[in-house]
Regions:
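A short alpha-helical cap/connector motif
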Residues: 1-121
Length: 121
């Protein structure tokens, strides 16, 4: 029987990431902003696709890794709104979204605490 740790490694390595995702993941790691795993990202992409999501709200942008996964599963005209308290991270996410070839019209990045921002949405 396979070891549980080996199973997790296989599962995470099984999902292929685009060059843009790999670059965003590297930036996130350099910044200390822990990105979602490939397996979690693939699950987010699948959920967005199955739901036919045209609008998604994300709390905690990081460097944009989870946002890239979500946008990949969303409708081509879908918009990701993402909130992060650290405006510096939003800048990195914006650059990672652009590097992935995404139009700025597909993302809305908001700096602030989610508890302050969400009631106004």
């Amino acid at each position: 029987m396979a070891d549980k740790a080996q199973t997790w490694v296989y599962t995470e390595d099984y999902v292929a990431e685009s060059d843009a995702l790999a670059a965003a993941r590297a930036v996130a790691s350099e910044l200390g902003a822990t990105p979602v795993s490939s397996g979690t990202g693939a699950a987010l992409r699948m959920l967005a696709a199955v739901a036919g999501a045209r609008a998604v709200l994300e709390v905690g942008t990081g460097a944009g890794v989870s946002g890239l996964w979500l946008l990949d599963g969303m409708a081509r005209d879908g918009v990701l709104t993402t909130i992060d308290v650290e405006s510096e991270l939003l800048g990195y996410a914006r650059r990672n979204f652009a590097a992935a070839g995404l139009s700025s019209h597909r993302t809305r990045l908001i700096a602030g605490r989610a508890l302050d921002v969400l009631p106004r949405m």
